[in-house]
């Protein structure tokens, strides 16, 4: 059975090459010039496109994560404890979810009040609505402190 398996890939490779050759032969009539324009541009972009791809990768990398900040807070609270990448991912998702809830709620509040701008007041009210009890109180006090520090500097 091993020789048959070896024969099949050998038979498939020429079969794969033949359609490519046939496509190249069929394409010259009208589509090959367009294909040539696209292929060299693609090849040219690979050389200079690595910068573009790197640019695209940079754009993908600009997706904000809170991993650095989660780690900093963890080290402030428990300096000798680490965190797994899966736990970090869960925490990052948690923060993104809370952020989306707060943003949505503050946008609703701005709409209800017929205001075009989300201010710290809408954010504070959204925090009180989204977060439960004591957690909301602490979040509001920390947020107020952060806004005061920001405006004073």
Curated annotation (Swiss-Prot):
PANTHER family registered for this protein in UniProt: HISTONE H2B (PTHR23428)
Compartment list: Nucleus; Chromosome
Stretches with biased composition (Basic and acidic residues): 1-28, 36-53
Native organism: Oryza sativa subsp. indica (Rice)
Protein name: Histone H2B.8
Highest taxon in the source lineage: Eukaryota
UniProt key word DNA-binding: yes
Molecular functions (GO terms): DNA binding; protein heterodimerization activity; structural constituent of chromatin
Disordered: annotated span: 1-61
GO cellular component terms, A-Z: nucleosome; nucleus
InterPro entries named among the record's database cross-references: Histone-fold (IPR009072), Histone_H2A/H2B/H3 (IPR007125), Histone_H2B (IPR000558), HISTONE_H2B_site (IPR055333)
PROSITE patterns per record: HISTONE_H2B (PS00357)
Main location: nucleus
UniProt similarity note: Belongs to the histone H2B family.
């Amino acid at each position: 059975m091993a020789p048959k398996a070896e024969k099949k890939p050998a038979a498939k490779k020429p079969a794969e090459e033949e359609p490519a050759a046939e496509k190249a032969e069929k394409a010259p009539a009208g589509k090959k010039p367009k294909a040539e324009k696209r292929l060299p541009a693609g090849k040219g972009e690979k050389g200079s496109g690595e910068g573009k791809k790197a640019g695209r990768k940079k754009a993908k990398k600009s997706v904000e994560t809170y991993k650095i900040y989660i780690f900093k807070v963890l080290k402030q609270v428990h300096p000798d404890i680490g965190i797994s990448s899966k736990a970090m991912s869960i925490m990052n998702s948690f923060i993104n979810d809370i952020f989306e809830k707060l943003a949505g709620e503050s946008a609703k509040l701005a709409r209800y009040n017929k205001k075009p701008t989300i201010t710290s007041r809408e954010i504070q009210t959204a925090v009180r609505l989204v977060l439960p009890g004591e957690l909301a109180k602490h979040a509001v006090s920390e947020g107020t402190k952060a806004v005061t520090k920001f405006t004073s500097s």
